[in-house]
Amino acid sequence: MRKWIAAAGLAYVLYGLFFYWYFFLSGDSAIPEAVKGTQADPASFMKPSELAVAEQYSNVKNFLFFIGVPLDWFLFFVLLVSGVSKKIKKWIEAAVPFRFLQTVGFVFVLSLITTLVTLPLDWIGYQVSLDYNISTQTTASWAKDQVISFWISFPIFTLCVLVFYWLIKRHEKKWWLYAWLLTVPFSLFLFFIQPVIIDPLYNDFYPLKNKELESKILELADEANIPADHVYEVNMSEKTNALNAYVTGIGANKRIVLWDTTLNKLDDSEILFIMGHEMGHYVMKHVYIGLAGYLLVSLAGFYVIDKLYKRTVRLTRSMFHLEGRHDLAALPLLLLLFSVLSFAVTPFSNAVSRYQENKADQYGIELTENREAAVKTFQDLAVTGLSQVDPPVLVKIFRGSHPSIMERIQHAEKEENAPEHQDADK
């Protein structure tokens, strides 16, 4: 047992050392020659000191992300190989009389252990954001958000475990298919209630306060055939200096949300471009496409998980102290497989997201007919968020849900030079 834990610990340390070297010792932040002197060149809109700080901040945040990903994996492996997972199950069975309550208790203890192990890394990330003046959130507010997240995820997680293990016992061969079929309406339900029930637990949402800006947005929304009452402002200035806007929800609860930091720090032309971008997501139904894609990928994922889970339990039954696939003590193994597979498909999902973001950028430029506002918006996003204009390759692959700032500015410049725009100017 100790050898396995030591080997896993060594692998984790070597993994961390690689990413330390990757971000802090080997990084080449040189701007391509073709970009120098253009609007995509960070030297044209950021001071040397700002560039240095953005580089430092991004490297630290990226490093924390990459060492955080396998931390759960290491924890789950240790719980299994040490027999702690089995001991927790036996302890709860002795303390609680009913199977339902035993499952709830086991999930609670596992969730609590996972939270306590990952909390220090989350705390470091929060402190880094404070140190670089990105976060404005108080410690009490940050702690409150952590508690809210735990009590939102715990009942959802518990429900999933109860259903999955019931299916594994009753339908050993087809449990993965039935589980996926149940996730379809469940995912739709969560998407539907998120804007009106879950999100307001963290922040205050309200209609736009700036009525003059609202009238401009109404005109833009009318051009895009979008209901104006679907545009909201959210109070984020108490937590961050960063800028953002997004589309969320489905059906009657679908809405476009603007952070108040965005409204406070950008001029009207930039805000209108951002609205045009988000309207592009709305018009092109990217939320629905993303949801459909998620459900299709999850179908394949459940199938793969079933095969891996069955084979892994058979091969490691003795080492992990498991009775079989139905054993609740095997839950860390199931979570390990889900987590690894989810991370493995991240490059694909990010590539799809970058494509959609690029399309939304194009839509926003065409709707507002203001390329300069788009370029200025991207530049301001980099400055206020201390974003790397051209992040390292692994960051683009595993964290890049949006094109890089450099790519977005270059795309905007290409949009300006496109044949249809040249023809329109003649």
From Swiss-Prot:
Catalytic residue positions: E278
Family to which this protein belongs: Belongs to the peptidase M48B family.
Reported cofactor(s): Zn(2+)
EC number in record: 3.4.24.-
PROSITE patterns reported for this sequence: ZINC_PROTEASE (PS00142)
Stated name of the protein: Uncharacterized metalloprotease YhfN
Cofactor info, note text: Binds 1 zinc ion per subunit.
Domain of life: Bacteria
Signal peptide: none
Gene name tied to this protein: yhfN
CDD domains: M48A_Zmpste24p_like (cd07343)
Organism for this UniProt entry: Bacillus subtilis (strain 168)
Taxonomic lineage: Bacteria, Bacillati, Bacillota, Bacilli, Bacillales
Gene Ontology biological process terms from the UniProt entry: CAAX-box protein processing
Entry keyword set: Hydrolase, Metal-binding, Metalloprotease, Protease, Zinc
Binding-site residues, Zn(2+): H277, H281, E357
GO molecular function: metal ion binding; metalloendopeptidase activity
